[in-house]
Amino acid sequence: MALRRHQMSRWTHPFASAIFLQCVAVSASHAVELNDVATDIDATELAQLNLDSYNPDDDEDGLDLYLDVTLNGASAGLTHFYYRDDQLWASPKILQQLGFVVPANNAEAILLNSLPDLKIDYDAQQQTLNLIAPLDILNLNTTVRSTRTNKRPQATSSSGMLLNYNIYGSQTQDSMKSLSAYTELRAFNKLGVLSSTALTSANSGTGNNSDWDRHSVRLDTSWSQSFPDKLITVRAGDILTSALSWTRPTRLGGLQIGTNFSLQPYRSTTPLPSFFGTATLPSAVELYVNGLKQYNGDVPAGPFELNTAPSFSGAGTAQLIVTDALGQSTTLNFSLYDAHRLLQSDLSDWSVELGTVRKSYGIHSFDYGSDIAASGTWRYGVSDRFTAETHVEVTNGLSNGGIAGTWLLGKSGGILFASLAGSESQGQKGMQYSANYSWNDSRFNFGLSALGAYGNYRDVGTQYGSAPASRSEQISTGYSTESMGRFGISYNQVSQSERDKAQFASAYWSKSFGRKLSLSANYNHDISSAENNSLYVSASLSLDRSISLSSSVQHTDNDTLFATDLSKPASNTGGIGWRAQARHRLNTGKNNKDSTSGVAELNYRGHYGQIQAGIAGDGGDYSSYASATGAVVTMGGGLFATRQINSGFAVVSTSGIANIPVSLQNSAIGTTNSKGLLLVTPLNAYQENKIGIDPMQLPADLRIDKVNI
């Protein structure tokens, strides 16, 4: 945005008024396209034709008429007809132009009254012809209405650097101190983004031992470049391999290339329902999905297709209400099933990686394996009802590969998934299978899944860590009602090669009473060991001024814990928040020792970051703590302190003019500093972000080139 002061002349307004009046004085013309018009007769002569004086013996073909035609409520313009034997005739070519289905071998003029179920309203005085025809004798184009959008805002990039930080410190009553900092350093320009994260910690002893034990570890360092038009991101450095529901991701140091759908967030990747209908007359269309209106609009006569992205998951019902110009309504019913695991037909999602396995992540900074590993993942939408998957990974002495598929059963029969994978490691082979089925609607849900491994099944991660689960099964179901709330039960069984089999059964219930009060309860039962059984009951109440009160009771075989929490979060626009918590534990175990603890905390959220501090006590012991989060950015010739940045941001420049108010999405976000700069955050990456200024709040002598971008 460029702003500059400009001296306005006194004659500006009269000159603008003169231009405006000159524009108003220009007359407008209207052109009408004729259908097969080959005559010089003007409209006045057409209106003066006297059909009563017409003698059919004088003209074998009949009298030529050019009538203003309306077909099924839509204007078709001036069209050539014959008037003979007190009837209207038209050539096959004319009828085809209007949209009628006419036999190809018919060359003779066709009597309009011979067309089945055609309603004819001919006004000789006005020279108009109104036709209403059934759709089965018309060949009209399908009208497509869509609420989907494939907008691709042009992303822009600038050069700069960013530092995100999260610092935490604590001290106990005996002077034991600890300090930790998580940092992310990011450098960026048109060539990509270079990012590095690290975790630094320091601890001191108690009493006279004031020595600090310091430790710092690098977490991830990578360079990435994205290509939004191709939906591809290239990443080099520390990467995480792509994984499917039946595979495990692995940390590598190397190169990754693959699909990144977040580069086009307006694009939908899952199959979206289409609704088809017909309208004899111009009509209004309303679409309801599960009782909620999703679309309303108008369609002309003829077949139409409505494409939309309804906001629901699982099974649902849709109603399409078509109301024509005469007020007559027709309702069409559809069964739907929305499946986010499916890809649209002919859409691919892929990723390939090459590198060495990262070991001791979070402990050592540069600990990598010696063997090269490679992996590849591909998902493909074979149709809107079936998506195929495959995954392959190899390293020295190991190969692993498998295939899978996701099916939508019928129109609303639920989702079925199955996979089969095999591996070979040091001459030993193994197999892994998985399958699951799920179905849900707005009230009921059901799920069943199983995974198992046979033989010596291994993947790349097994070479440096634990093996995948050898067996797991899960079954769950739930139901929701307005009067009784949501409730359900589930059963889980997991077996690891190094551990005993674990079996759990659980049940839950929750209900909201209006907008302020909600209750919930959850029971977990360990089938293998009753000592791990637990019952959790909680209540949450929303009070005035954004204050919330919650209380809970958790009971196990050894103790019962009571907790009450009263809090007010800091506003997103900035301000002070606080939290107070009290906890009391009744111990019924061997030591039979009860305890009481509590927390008091204050936090502040401002334009430059967020800080919080608190005191925690447990019995006679207490500790204090504090933390700070934020970011420092250098870009566009300025240095800025702001809240932590995890998405897009921009620097607004007003050519050195200070105190210019700036808005984001029509909400005030701040004013420019003494250099005419303002950092605007957060922005939605690869989406439309409306940044602007309010010209009504600016001095009258400022010339504005642009008020929003």
Go through each PLM region and give its residues.
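A short, solvent-exposed beta-strand micro-motif common in secreted/extracellular proteins
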Residues: 91-97, 319-322, 600-603, 686-698
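Short Pro-Gly-centered beta-turn/loop motif in secreted/extracellular proteins
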Residues: 82-90, 309-315, 677-691, 697-699, ...
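Structured interaction patches on ligand/partner-binding surfaces of diverse proteins
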Residues: 106-116, 330-334, 697-709
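Low-complexity, Pro/Ser/Thr- and charge-rich linker/hinge segments at domain boundaries
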Residues: 139-158, 330-363, 548-551, 636-653
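Feature captures outer-membrane beta-barrel proteins of Gram-negative bacteria and organelles
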Residues: 153-154, 179-191, 212-228, 368-384, ...
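Post-signal-peptide, soluble extracytosolic/periplasmic N-terminal scaffold domains
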Residues: 2-4, 11-12, 17-21, 28-269, ...
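Short, acidic Ser/Thr/Gly-rich low-complexity loop/linker segments typical of extracellular
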Residues: 668-676
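Outer-membrane beta-barrel pore domains and translocons
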Residues: 166-172, 199-203, 239-241, 280, ...
